[in-house]
Amino acid sequence: MFKFNEEKGQLKCSFCGKSQEQVRKLVAGPGVYICDECIDLCTEIVEEELGTEEDMEMNEIPKPKEICDILDDYVIGQDKAKKNLSVAVYNHYKRVNSGKGNDEVEIAKSNIAMIGPTGSGKTLLAQTLARIINVPFAMADATSLTEAGYVGEDVENILLKLIQAADYDVEKAEKGIIYIDEIDKVARKSENPSITRDVSGEGVQQALLKILEGTVASVPPQGGRKHPHQEFIQIDTTNILFIVGGAFDGIDQVIKRRLGKKVIGFGSHEKQEDLDTGQLLSKVLPEDLLRYGLIPEFIGRIPVIGSLTPLDEEALIEILTKPKNALVKQYQKLFEIDHVELEFEEEALQEIAKKAIERKTGARGLRSIIEGIIVDVMFDIPSREDVDRCIITKETVSDDDGSPKLVFRDGTVKLGNEKLPKESA
């Protein structure tokens, strides 16, 4: 009930009791009045509450061990890389949170480089990290980037992808993660600075420097090149975590040459010839990246280096079966929808892993191998209701004309490439 001063015939604020003469503005509502001073006070209270909630969200970032445990559910192996990434990501978002205070100590930004062969899990690790932290995530291919003014994508277009992933919420995008793949492809051709213009190599590294370090970038809302009189989205990259990744083919030889200089003599126990590719990659240093072709300024902006080892047969089999979204589980789900049980024999899984190693495709090649094996069966099964089980054997994978074994509901067993019996009415 609103307050009314009967003696003077004046309305009063329902919250503080001040009359309309004592305040600048009195806003009327259904049966109540509120003055401008109470409105300001309410606004401050709401802003403080929302600000506290945001800080709480930042404080609820999983601890490094918790991040690593979640990564274990989706990514097989690469324990050292997962540990390094978990610590780096946790520290990055601690830094973001600490920046809100007035502390004189400013924590430097720590972007991450991931070095490892194709199919070792670089992209999956970056995607999973973004899901764990629940921040916008964007992925870009360094090979499509060129220096500003040349044919190709400007580096600002990477930021546009992140803004789009955040539904154009710039404030949210400013705390996101960007993964730049194939960064090794923009390495310059030699250690020495290029005399000629290298617009897709060293030029791209130079163009990336500012956004890696932290700057307010102007991004064209529709992408493409910048034009005069165009509206831009302003985004601060200071708190965006950049993860760059690449196979860096041949860097193991660079590391081997560096180690070779240190093992000459009778006192050395571990010679570089005894180290495999994975062990060599684990010893990578910034100076190796410099020799490979990354410029010193670029290396200085990615202080955290994580190496991923090539996946062996055992790891590939685990990738097929262990993670929550394992490939075998995915295909079993697809067959289950058609009321058919899909079964992989242990020897079949071993053969699939061997094929992936032979093709040097790592985990990335597993899906195409399985798809090639069962595509004919997936074509026929949806049209039939008499198939009970589909079994993938060693011969199915190893033989050129291998085919899955089909078990029918009447007990009949046939190979998928045999002429199938007509379905009974």
UniProtKB/Swiss-Prot annotation:
GO molecular function, one term: unfolded protein binding
UniProt superkingdom: Bacteria
Keyword field contains DNA-binding: no
Family matches, as InterPro entries: AAA+_ATPase, ATP-dep_Clp_protease_ClpX, ATPase_AAA_core, Clp_ATPase_C, Clp_protease_ATP-bd_su_ClpX, ClpX_bact, P-loop_NTPase, Znf_CppX_C4
Chain positions recorded as Zn(2+) binding sites: 13, 16, 35, 38
ClpX-type ZB domain mapped to chain residues: 1-54
HAMAP family in alphabetical order: ClpX
Record's subunit section: Component of the ClpX-ClpP complex. Forms a hexameric ring that, in the presence of ATP, binds to fourteen ClpP subunits assembled into a disk-like structure with a central cavity, resembling the structure of eukaryotic proteasomes.
Protein role: ATP-dependent specificity component of the Clp protease. It directs the protease to specific substrates. Can perform chaperone functions in the absence of ClpP.
Homology family: Belongs to the ClpX chaperone family.
Protein name: ATP-dependent Clp protease ATP-binding subunit ClpX
Organism: Oceanobacillus iheyensis (strain DSM 14371 / CIP 107618 / JCM 11309 / KCTC 3954 / HTE831)
Name of the gene: clpX
